């Protein structure tokens, strides 16, 4: 069945992964239009290559790795790094209580923001994140620890 997932239609692919990839790219890029572009490029690469995977987890990891690389390319090419406003986040359907957390998360350095998003939002283990980012699991654990500390300071200092 996993091999069939590499051959699913574009609509099925978007339904299955589109929203999670968009949230991930939005956190990395801080710009909805750039996030949409990164998701489209990621899905296009998937469709062009038609990779086969042994499991849905491997497929998902491949997509998020490609999306992360696309986001990094966008950040390298950009001369500025716009940040989402609270109004833009509210327009994406976030609850008011989530806005403070999302705003604080957006203010963190990329390496912490990325680790926290992959672990707590997307549900990846430290080992999976380490593999995606080319780091050791212990380095990811340290990023998560430091990221939580920074996020707490961001949230409570902002009150």
Please give the residue ranges for each predicted region.
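Arg/Lys-rich amphipathic alpha helix in sigma70-family domain 2
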Residues: 48, 54, 64-84, 146
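C-terminal flanking helix
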Residues: 22, 43, 109, 113, ...
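A short, charge-rich alpha-helical start-of-domain segment used by transcription regulators
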Residues: 1-23, 36
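Sigma70-family region 2
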Residues: 2-4, 30, 41-58, 77-79, ...
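DNA-recognition helix of helix-turn-helix
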Residues: 68, 72, 133-158
């Amino acid at each position: 069945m996993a091999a069939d997932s590499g051959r699913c239609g574009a609509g099925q692919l978007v339904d299955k992964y589109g929203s999670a990839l968009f949230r991930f790219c939005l956190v990395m890029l801080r710009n909805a239009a750039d996030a949409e572009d990164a998701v489209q490029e990621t899905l296009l690469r998937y469709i062009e290559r038609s990779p086969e995977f042994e499991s849905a987890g491997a497929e998902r990891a491949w997509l998020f790795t490609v999306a992360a690389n696309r986001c990094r390319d966008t950040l390298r090419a950009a001369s500025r790094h716009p940040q989402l406003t609270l109004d833009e986040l509210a327009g994406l359907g976030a609850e008011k209580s989530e806005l403070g957390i999302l705003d604080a998360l957006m203010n963190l350095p990329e390496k912490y923001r990325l680790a926290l998003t992959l672990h707590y939002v997307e549900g990846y283990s430290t080992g999976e994140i380490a593999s995606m980012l080319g780091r050791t699991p212990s380095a990811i654990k340290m990023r998560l620890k430091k990221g939580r500390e920074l996020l707490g300071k961001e949230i409570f200092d902002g009150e």
